[in-house]
Amino acid sequence: CTVGELDLGVLSPLAEVAPSFMREELLRVQDVQERDSATILDGLQDTAGERGPALYVHGYYIGFDKGCRRAALLQQNANLAGRFLWFSWPSDGAAAYYTHDEADLYWSVPDLADSIIELERRFGAEAVDVIGHSLGARGVVLALYEVANRRPDIRLGHVALLAPDMDFEIFARMLPRIEPIADSMTVYVASGDKPLALSKQVHGYARLGESGNDVSRILGVEVIDLSDLPNDSPTGHLYHIYSPAVGRDLQQLLNEGKRASERSGLVAQGSN
């Protein structure tokens, strides 16, 4: 899909000083083209460079149109142009249909696993990065678990889980199976994340993307706590598309392959 900014004419100066979280409302999907996977991957091979593709999976309450706009914002914020690939699963796109979206996500996990395996086959070992936000991060973990069972020899690049809406304890149990198939695994967490706080109430257990979990139990995973950053969105859940600091950190991780100890702007607070 092709996304562009609205032409606001005389109101353009107001748009320039609007809060960062308003940027999404200034974007519109201009064009959607259907292409076969071979054509898409051929084009990606020409533009991705040495790093290979970065596959992004969106979260809950994200219909196709909103997904296009959010994907465009993440691509821009993390400087992933040329290597960005968006996996769109059939979210109902309605706030009241959270459990419907959970079912839709689970239905899509085998296809996501197939996509990851095909990308690694096409681009090679450690060349494919995988990014998941919110409920989409849960889908990434479940897909990686399936990939590890089907292809224990596979080797991916960096896995980044942004505000993951997943049970912390379930992730800890699945980690030993999925951690060996990725070059690195990074989880971004924050306090004040309202959707994750609500998800905790719904499920009864702490979410992986909330700060305050005993992260020493998930050794091998680098945990980036963003709680001290300014809140760039009303919900505290969309820092990956609205926070320039998070965008810079993702660029250093995904484009430059730097571990947390090598990236600027981070302060070590524990072993992981």
Please give the residue ranges for each predicted region.
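Lipolytic serine-hydrolase domain surface
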Residues: 1-48, 68-72, 76-127, 144-158, ...
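Short His-Asn-centered micro-motif
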Residues: 57-58, 133, 162-164
